[in-house]
């Protein structure tokens, strides 16, 4: 039983590379991981894959929380922040708590991801077309490769 717990703990640590990130650049890259995961989560919601939506959201949330903690602890150089963090995300990192900031980031990432899905010209797309467009965007963005596998 003890061996199984130790093995599980070791596998968990090895499967969580972001928790061991120590360089400024690695922390900054987490902002891009969070943004991409939030975009992909929004797309998965459109084609009704709730497990994938949740997996991506939780990964984005974890990466975002780690990124914000590192940013607040001044562990990220300005150079890395400028080169790795999505510019819009950088504008949204204000607010009373990290969760509030991540809520703003999620909303903006969702809007960016769904812009080509929800409307064509000035009219709303029907549900079946939205699902198809969301699936196409999801595949084009290689969303399945983001975060730990299902």
Predicted regions and their residues:
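N-terminal secretory signal peptides that target proteins for export/translocation
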Residues: 1-2
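Sec-dependent N-terminal signal peptides
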Residues: 5-14
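Short amphipathic alpha-helical segments and their helix-coil junctions
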Residues: 19-29, 117-126
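Immediate post-signal-peptide N-terminus of mature secreted/exported proteins
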Residues: 22-52
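Alpha-helical solenoid repeat scaffolds, predominantly canonical TPR units
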Residues: 37, 53-63
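Short, solvent-exposed secondary-structure capping/transition elements
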Residues: 46-55, 69-73
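Compact alpha-helical subdomains of small soluble proteins
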Residues: 64-150
């Amino acid at each position: 039983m003890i061996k199984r717990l130790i093995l599980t703990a070791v596998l968990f640590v090895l499967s969580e590379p972001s928790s061991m990130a120590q360089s400024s650049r690695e922390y900054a890259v987490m902002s891009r991981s969070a943004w991409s995961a939030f975009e992909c989560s929004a797309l998965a919601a459109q084609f009704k894959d709730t497990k994938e939506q949740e997996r991506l959201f939780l990964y984005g949330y974890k990466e975002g929380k780690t990124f914000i903690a590192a940013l607040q602890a001044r562990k990220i150089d300005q150079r890395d922040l400028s080169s790795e963090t999505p510019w819009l995300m950088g504008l949204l990192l204000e607010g009373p708590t990290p969760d509030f900031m991540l809520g703003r980031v999620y909303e903006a990432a969702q809007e960016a991801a769904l812009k080509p899905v929800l409307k064509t010209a000035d009219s709303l797309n029907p549900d079946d077309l939205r699902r198809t467009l969301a699936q196409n965007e999801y595949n084009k963005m290689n969303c399945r490769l983001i975060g730990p596998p299902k």
